[in-house]
């Protein structure tokens, strides 16, 4: 292409800016510092609209108060009867995600029945602002208190992965 030939480096004149990556060596935000995984295969059952622990719990100790924690959850859950199942997530005693908090965690719909298993996949970022051990857990309920909701039904596994991200 004649236009490209006209742009040959030999035709450039004057001082060109120099770019150095040396000043970027101190940037560490966004780096994964540690990964912790947890799982549960212990079945828990609910016929109540009161939230209860699902048995899925993970713990991570951030290295800095500026670190973020990426929380990834795959919660095994099933129900029978005309009800809905809700999942919510806690850091210690503080709700950080779930149906009540209005985060992007849903519920099973009324068409799932006869012990057909489904699951919730959840991903969200938390800012614990701590260098002490931080515990995350899921809770579940049976929203209409009819039928039965089960997590880890028949020893099906639920998983939690916690990634510390440099802040």
Q: What residue spans do the PLM features occupy?
A:
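Residue-level signal for the start and early helices of compact helical domains
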Residues: 3, 7-10, 15, 27-29, ...
């Amino acid at each position: 292409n004649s236009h490209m030939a006209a742009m040959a480096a030999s035709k450039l004149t004057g001082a060109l800016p120099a770019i150095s990556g040396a000043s970027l060596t101190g940037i560490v935000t966004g780096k994964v510092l540690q990964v912790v995984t947890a799982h549960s295969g212990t079945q828990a059952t609910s016929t109540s609209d009161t939230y209860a622990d699902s048995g899925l719990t993970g713990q991570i100790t951030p290295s800095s108060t500026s670190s973020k924690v990426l929380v990834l959850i795959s919660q095994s859950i099933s129900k029978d009867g005309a009800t809905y199942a809700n999942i919510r997530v806690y850091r210690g005693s503080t709700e950080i995600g779930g149906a009540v908090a209005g985060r992007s965690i849903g519920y099973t719909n009324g068409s799932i029945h006869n012990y057909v298993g489904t699951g919730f996949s959840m991903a969200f970022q938390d800012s614990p602002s701590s260098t002490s051990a931080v515990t995350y857990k899921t809770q579940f309920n049976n929203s209409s208190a009819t039928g039965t909701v089960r997590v880890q039904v028949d020893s099906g596994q639920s998983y939690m992965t916690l990634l510390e991200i440099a802040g």
